[in-house]
Each structure stands twice: as C-alpha cells, then as structure tokens.
C-alpha cells in the first residue's frame, strides 16, 4: 500500500499499526471534526481484573460548535488521568517480559503535559513505532493524494 489516511488514536488498535506497517506513508487526518467516544481519546488494556478502559479527558467547546481534531485540548482539571493510566499499565504489565525496557519511555509520555490531544497521539505513535523498531514517514495534515482504501479505515474507532 502506497499511502494511508488515518485518524490519530490514543494507543491505536493493533489493526491500525498493521495497516501503518504495510504503507509507505501515513497521513493523519486533522482537519475533520472531532468525534466523541472513539479511539481518539480511549484505549483498552488487559489488567489483573480483565479488560480496562483508559480515557483521556478533553476540554469540550463551550460555544457548542464542532472542534477540529487538531484543536482538541486535553483537560487536566477533571482527574489525574496520567497517573491513573501509568499505574494501570504498571499493574497490568510490570511482570511481563521486557516491560522494564519500555517503562521509562512510557513514564516520560505520561509525565509530559501535552496541551493538545494530537501532541499526545504523536508521542504515543513515535513510542510504539520505536518499540516495533520500525520507521514511519507521516504527515500531520490532509494529504490529498493519499489513497483511502478499506484497510485505511481499520482502527479508526468509527
């Protein structure tokens, strides 16, 4: 696959990374309107108590207008979500082989205060690609020549 157009996600589903690894160039769609209750702000992990949802709180538009994906801001006032996510990952995976090799990088992601949701997505994406020892060329804006195929819709949370 030459190019792929994807919605940025928080710890994207594995199907999205499979599609990314099969493409030469990834374009993250940022000009679309943000949709609630998608993988853009949430991911699922396996914890000692079963499947667990991790959700990134966002600031909602006060004027009732739709917000573009690139303009979505993270809400740090509602809950200490970064501590919760990091502790959940530690509880679920600390005893897993090789977790210790990734723990410092994960901690750095969760200690950083990302202003925009997409900044968090980029850090997570770069972490995962580095952990997979893969390189990925990507664009942060709409790329009109991107080929949108059925496989490019995998993992969009829609």
Predicted regions and their residues:
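Residues lining hydrophobic/aromatic ligand-binding pockets adjacent to catalytic sites
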Residues: 1-158
């Amino acid at each position: 696959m030459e190019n792929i157009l994807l919605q940025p996600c928080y710890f994207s589903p594995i199907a999205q990374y499979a599609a990314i690894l099969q493409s030469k160039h990834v374009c993250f769609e940022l000009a679309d309107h943000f949709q609630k209750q998608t993988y853009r702000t949430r991911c699922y992990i396996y914890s000692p108590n079963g499947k667990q949802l991790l959700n990134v709180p966002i600031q909602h538009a006060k004027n009732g207008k739709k917000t573009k994906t690139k303009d979505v801001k993270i809400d740090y006032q509602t809950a200490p979500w970064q501590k919760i996510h990091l502790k959940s990952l530690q509880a679920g995976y600390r005893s897993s082989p090789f977790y210790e090799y990734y723990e410092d990088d994960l901690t750095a992601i969760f200690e950083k205060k990302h202003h925009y949701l997409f900044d968090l997505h980029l850090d997570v994406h770069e972490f995962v690609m580095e952990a997979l020892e893969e390189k990925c060329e990507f664009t942060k804006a709409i790329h009109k020549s991107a080929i949108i195929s059925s496989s490019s819709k995998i993992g969009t949370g829609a």
